[in-house]
Curated annotation (Swiss-Prot):
GO terms for molecular function: GTP binding; hydrolase activity; mRNA 5'-cap (guanine-N7-)-methyltransferase activity; mRNA guanylyltransferase activity; RNA binding. This is Protein VP3. HAMAP family: Rota_VP3, Rota_VP3_A. Interacts with VP1. Interacts with VP2. Keywords: GTP-binding, Host-virus interaction, Hydrolase, Inhibition of host innate immune response by virus, Methyltransferase, mRNA capping, mRNA processing, Multifunctional enzyme, Nucleotide-binding, Nucleotidyltransferase, RNA-binding, S-adenosyl-L-methionine, Transferase, Viral immunoevasion, Virion. It catalyses: a 5'-end diphospho-ribonucleoside in mRNA + GTP + H(+) = a 5'-end (5'-triphosphoguanosine)-ribonucleoside in mRNA + diphosphate; a 5'-end (5'-triphosphoguanosine)-ribonucleoside in mRNA + S-adenosyl-L-methionine = a 5'-end (N(7)-methyl 5'-triphosphoguanosine)-ribonucleoside in mRNA + S-adenosyl-L-homocysteine; 5'-triphosphoadenylyl-(2'->5')-adenylyl-(2'->5')-adenosine + 2 H2O = 2 AMP + ATP + 2 H(+). The active site is at 718 (for 2'-5'-phosphodiesterase activity), 720 (for 2'-5'-phosphodiesterase activity), 797 (for 2'-5'-phosphodiesterase activity), 799 (for 2'-5'-phosphodiesterase activity). The keyword Transport does not apply. Residues 693-835 are annotated as: 2'-5'-phosphodiesterase activity. Pfam families: Rotavirus_VP3 (PF06929). Residues 556-692 are annotated as: GTase/RTPase activity. Its EC number is 3.1.4.-, 2.7.7.50, 2.1.1.56. Multifunctional enzyme involved in mRNA capping. Catalyzes the formation of the 5' cap structure on the viral plus-strand transcripts. Specifically binds to GTP and displays guanylyltransferase and methyltransferase activities. Has affinity for ssRNA but not for dsRNA. Capping activity is non-specific and caps RNAs that initiate with either a G or an A residue. Together with VP1 polymerase, forms a VP1-VP3 complex positioned near the channels situated at each of the five-fold vertices of the core. Counteracts the host innate immune response thanks to its phosphodiesterase that degrades the 5'-triphosphorylated, 2'-5' linked adenylate oligomers produced by the host cell IFN-inducible 2',5'-oligoadenylate synthetase (OAS). The host RNaseL is therefore not activated.
Length: 835
């Protein structure tokens, strides 16, 4: 959903669009709630309130103020991520395909021959980090840039087994045009760029678990963040390899050597960060022209000092000369050294060339060892070739993708490696490594151990659900970690599957009820975005690879109606009820009937079940941005801080009734996951509320009326407003509650329109308009620790006779209350009051 705010209506009609006119009779929160439950994707919001827009954005729903038709058209034609704190719109708009254009934010790609392999007549455009260079295309009242690129396709091609780039690109563009937009993945870079500066500013010690290549630039500005990944491939792991020969396989049609060099250097930087927690100077020998340096500098400020006879235009300092072993003394401490020296083959035959390469490999290693043997805080990444060689058993081997699989690979060495044991590795083993292993991640830090760390803030995005982790250990970590942002895969299956397939692995699945948390928010991706200054124009799909975002130790926990709130809680219900259901009242009718309340007159205004909890359960796949457990808990302890809107405090029994309705809904739909979720939420309600039942009551509250429009043969027809189980010394407390509620009780608009047999030999009249007052009275008694109400549904009725009679219908008749009293069952009246 996206909300586009306008001061004036527009003549143009757009598909999947509704118009909402601000209702001045309601406050900003109520207007926001009504907007959030509209069913169209595009909402044109007229006569808007800025506060309402802010409320929607904090809820994760993109709401943007537009000042011109051009702005409206730009936003209505595509999806986007909105930085509402800085008023920046990041479009995810691929309409540039209509210009026969693909886009990249990787500068090095523009310096390759990729254009020879594009679709006929197509071009490549560099758009800068997150499309920053496109800002000039949009002369808008808000900052706007198109973050859409085709880098995901290019990178997927590089790591694939396919060689024909044009066919690969064509297939992927067609897939993009025929499948739903993966909005979470596209907006994730924007999210990370907001998230980590925020966390790093507030917490000195930050742990990040499971970063992948898409985050390779995000963390360049955060050397103190401790990374955990899947670990490095080290020399001693090669013992498992069988010897092979040179393969000579082409990986990419266009030259990706610069990409390989960039990955090597970035891998080395992060390895350095994990050791020394600061930014190094970056020395590079060879690898000119290194256009990729421009990319790195767009994200973070580094000093690059380079040696190569060929120009390196983006280096900070370039020495247009060769580097020799004696020059090592020029290199300072607190640095990384990338050695990529390789003489051009020119016209040498392969045997002579092989000798030169092996000599250079030995020379490169000597430079590396000399560099690491003196000074402090140093890491080296060195180019090697497959040959009989001794290497430290702890050296980290790299084989990032390059244009052709030939003989080269790289090793990362630190100051400890050069003093450790070395092992002789034959050439064939290195070929086996090169032929079969591709380094897929620039983060090669050791794996994370699933243990809470009280002094750290842990971030684990899409990293812990894999089934090689113990599911219970993941739950324990989340329960015990005081400060964290951790995601786990949501169980949105229908058969309550404990794990589901994802690519070539399996993920554990989770529901919010799997965790026992306080001061934590459990929400969706868009709900989480709202907490960090972002909002989204497109929610996650209800099925597929979706995640719960669990934020521990957030200062937004008590801001119940601002973050992870009830916005959109009824949207799916509206979509169903106003399109394919038997009646738009279907939800109300089902909730009453499933709790054995057969009086459906006015069911849409006087329902016996919490619609919030019911919708949050049966449609949780659509609206899990709403943190139901937090909502229940804060109500149970009386700490609900509400800024605005129509606030109705539910009685705990209403929540129980909702769970029962949801359970029956799940059984009818054969939805085993909702069935378990409803059962567990009911258990949670009973845990946090101290609910007691007057199933063996000794007192009741009765209401008598001045006018009963039916014949009756009981002595005094009355409405039982509830039963109690109390000791005699609690009578004064009950009376005090009744006196406090007196005005509201007598203002209750009770009406009747038919009579019926409640049980055999119990003839009663219906009583409408009672439930709202009953639940308020229930809450009053609950807060005063007085047992009121039974475990079964309260059905308001007036007993007329203890004999069997036929149903009679009349025009709805208002009943005038005569008196309200407290009486002992089979005893005397102990309190009576009249208006």
């Amino acid at each position: 959903m996206k909300v586009l705010a306008l001061r004036h209506s527009v003549a143009q009609v757009y598909a999947d669009t509704q118009t909402y006119l601000h209702d001045d009779s309601k406050d900003e929160y109520e207007n926001a709630f009504l907007i959030s439950n509209l069913t169209a994707h595009n909402i044109l919001y007229l006569n808007y309130s800025l506060k309402t827009l802010k409320i929607l954005n904090k809820s994760g729903i993109a709401a943007v103020e537009t000042q011109s038709p051009d702005e409206l058209f730009a936003l209505i034609r595509c999806n986007f991520t909105y930085d509402y704190e800085n008023n920046i719109v990041y479009l995810h708009d691929y309409s540039y395909y209509t210009n026969n254009e693909i886009r990249t934010d990787q500068h090095w790609i523009t310096k390759t021959d990729i254009i020879d392999y594009l679709l006929p007549g197509w071009k490549l455009t560099y758009v800068g980090y997150n499309g920053k260079n496109t800002r000039g295309h949009y002369n808008f009242s808000f900052s706007c840039q198109n973050a859409a690129t085709d880098d995901d396709i290019i990178v997927e091609y590089i790591y694939s087994n396919e060689l024909d780039f044009q066919n690969f690109m064509l297939r992927k563009i067609k897939e993009r045009m025929t499948t739903s937009l993966p909005i979470a993945r596209l907006s994730n870079r924007v999210f990370r760029d907001k998230l980590f500066p925020s966390i790093a500013n507030m917490h000195k010690r930050v742990i990040n678990v499971g970063p992948r290549n898409e985050s390779m630039f995000t963390f360049l500005n955060f050397p103190t963040i401790k990374q955990f990944s899947n670990g490095a491939y080290i020399v001693k792991h090669t013992i498992k390899l069988k010897q092979e020969k040179w393969l000579g396989k082409r990986v990419s049609q266009f030259d990706i050597g610069q990409y390989k060099n960039m990955l090597n250097v970035v891998t080395t930087i992060y390895y350095y960060y994990n050791l020394y927690h600061s930014k190094p100077i970056i020395y590079m020998l060879g690898s000119a022209p290194s256009y990729w340096i421009y990319n790195v500098k767009q994200y973070s400020d580094f000093t690059f000092e380079t040696w190569d006879p060929v120009d390196t235009p983006y280096s900070t300092t370039h020495h247009k000369e060769l580097f020799f072993d004696k020059d090592v003394m020029k290199l300072k401490d607190d640095s990384v050294l990338y050695i990529d020296i390789r003489t051009d083959r020119k016209n040498m035959d392969w045997k002579e060339w092989r000798k030169v390469v092996e000599q250079q490999t030995v020379s490169n290693l000597n430079i590396a060892y000399n560099y690491l043997s003196t000074g402090k805080a140093k890491v080296c990444c060195v180019k090697l070739t497959a040959m009989d060689l001794e290497l430290p058993i702890t050296a980290k081997l790299l084989h990032h993708p390059t244009t052709e699989v030939r003989s080269e690979f790289y090793a990362i060495l630190d100051v400890w490696d050069i003093i450790t044991i070395k092992r002789f590795i034959p050439k064939g083993v290195f070929y086996a490594f090169i032929n079969n292993i591709t380094t897929e991640n620039v983060f090669i830090q050791p794996p994370f151990k699933l243990k809470a760390s009280p002094t750290d803030y842990i971030v684990a995005l899409y990293a812990l659900s894999n089934d090689f982790n113990s599911r219970q250990d993941v739950i324990n970590l989340i329960n015990k970690q005081k400060q964290s942002l951790i995601t786990v895969r949501i169980n949105n299956t229908f058969k309550d599957e404990p794990k589901v397939n994802f690519k070539n692995i399996y993920d554990w699945t989770f529901l919010p009820t799997d965790f026992e948390l306080k001061d934590s928010v459990i929400t969706s991706y868009d709900g989480c975005l709202g907490m960090f200054g972002l909002s989204l124009s497109l929610s996650s799909k209800p099925t597929g690879n979706n995640h719960l975002f669990i934020i521990n130790g957030t200062d937004k926990y008590y801001k119940l109606d601002q973050y992870a709130n009830h916005m959109g809680i009824s949207r799916r219900s509206h979509q169903i009820r106003f399109s394919e259901s038997a009646t738009s009242y279907s939800g109300y009718i089902f909730r009453d009937l499933s709790n054995n309340n057969f009086n459906l007159i006015g069911t849409n205004v006087e329902n016996s079940v919490s619609g919030h909890v019911y919708n949050a359960l049966i449609y949780y796949r659509y609206n899990y941005a709403f943190d139901l457990k937090r909502w229940i808990y804060l109500h149970s302890i009386g700490k609900v801080a509400v800024e605005g809107g129509r606030y109705y405090e539910h009685a705990p029994i209403e929540l129980i009734y909702a769970c029962r309705s949801a359970r029956e809904f799940a059984i009818l739909q054969d939805d085993l996951t909702v069935l378990r979720y409803a059962n567990e939420i009911e258990g949670y309600i009973n845990k946090v509320y101290s609910i007691t039942y007057a199933d063996d009551p000794n007192y009741f509250i009765g209401i008598t009326f001045n006018n009963i429009p039916y014949e009756y043969d009981v002595k005094v027809p009355h409405l039982t407003l509830g039963v109690l189980f109390i000791s005699d010394n609690m009578i004064d407390e009950v009376v005090a509650v009744l006196k406090e509620m007196k005005t509201e009780l007598f203002k209750t608009e009770i009406s009747t329109s038919y009579n019926y047999m409640l049980f055999d030999n119990v003839y009663v009249a219906n009583a409408s308009g009672v439930l709202s007052t009953y639940f308020k009275l229930y809450n009053m008694f609950y807060r005063n620790h007085i047992t009121f109400g039974q475990s079964r549904m309260f059905i308001p009725h007036i007993t007329l006779s203890f004999s069997n009679k036929r149903t009679i219908r009349i025009e709805s008749t208002r009943l005038k209350i005569n008196s309200i009293y407290l009486r002992k069952i089979r005893g005397e009246t102990v309190f009576d009051m009249s208006e």
